[in-house]
Amino acid sequence: MDSFVSTYLWPALIMIGQSLLLLVCLLVFIAYILLADRKIWAAVQLRRGPNVVGPFGLFQSFADLLKFMVKEPIIPAGANKAVFLLAPLVSVVLALSTWAVVPVANGWVIANINVGILYILAISSLEVYGIIMGGWASNSKYPFLGALRSAAQMVSYEVSIGLVIVTVLLCVGSLNLTDIVMSQQTGLGTKLGLPASFLDWHWLSLFPMFIVFFISALAETNRPPFDLPEAESELVAGFMVEYGSAPYMMFMLGEYAAVVLMCSLTTILFLGGWLPPVDIWILSWVPGIIWFMLKACFVFFMFAMVKAFVPRYRYDQLMRLGWKVFLPLSLAMVVIVAFVLKLTGWA
């Protein structure tokens, strides 16, 4: 009995506790990321934004959560009830499950698997099914058109994201996310004789891929200017037209969880993860999770600024950018990076 407890039960309880702690912290972080998104957009438009619930509106997201939870869900008469209610659940569960392999500091990860980046690609590619299910089950033309747009958009830009990640993997030689971060302790800067700093991170040596990944992440998460699946001026609200109350909240939660995941992936792949910007003793005292969160928040700030300033693309422009610009550029960069690594032996 003691061996069973020590071998199976106790590790399982620890894993469950870690998962619950990560889930709570992630949901709170998403709540404030959502508030920051609204505040930034309001500031650009010279408005004050949410400022009533709590000091400076800090509890606005929790008030919205309570409002959504107490509302009655309305299911359209012609909808497939089971699939209609299952779709937002699928969306949010898949979006949250990818966080099991994301390291937020050295050793701070639930499952430090050797194929972590492959796991994230596999799970994130399934998230489109929640949108397709919601659009089809609504039995309405606008949700269905939004779901079709989302499927085409996510498939188009997943190819570019995959090729960008391949260029990073060529430089690192590992699919493990922790190894990808630690490999950025030395890079282009140190090879040129400079002290270890942010110049060693992949954003500089793979700058074109950094830009492609950032823009593709916007398209993958349906963020403006690529919010074609829920374009208000064209499709009213896209695949979420018929949703309200808790199901709508779950779709929104899944969307922002995917956005925060892409911000974290950008941090891990190109911005050194939890590494300090300069390797000096005073910055090394700062916990790695603080650096990770600051970098992820910076990437999200860029997401929010793009939302505020860049007008929405037309659908044909979106497809042209993905297939005629990003795909050839990503393929060319894979070949160029492989050639340079073979020639210089820097891998």
From Swiss-Prot:
GO terms for molecular function: NADH dehydrogenase activity; oxidoreductase activity, acting on NAD(P)H, quinone or similar compound as acceptor; quinone binding. PROSITE patterns: COMPLEX1_ND1_2 (PS00668). InterPro entries: NADH_UbQ_OxRdtase_su1/FPO (IPR001694), NADH_UbQ_OxRdtase_su1_CS (IPR018086). GO terms for biological process: aerobic respiration. It catalyses: a quinone + NADH + 5 H(+)(in) = a quinol + NAD(+) + 4 H(+)(out). It is a multi-pass membrane protein. GO terms for cellular component: plasma membrane. The chain crosses the membrane at residues 13-33, 82-102, 115-135, 161-181, 198-218, 258-278, 286-306, 321-341. HAMAP family: NDH1_NuoH. Belongs to the complex I subunit 1 family. NDH-1 is composed of 14 different subunits. Subunits NuoA, H, J, K, L, M, N constitute the membrane sector of the complex. This is NADH-quinone oxidoreductase subunit H. The gene is nuoH.
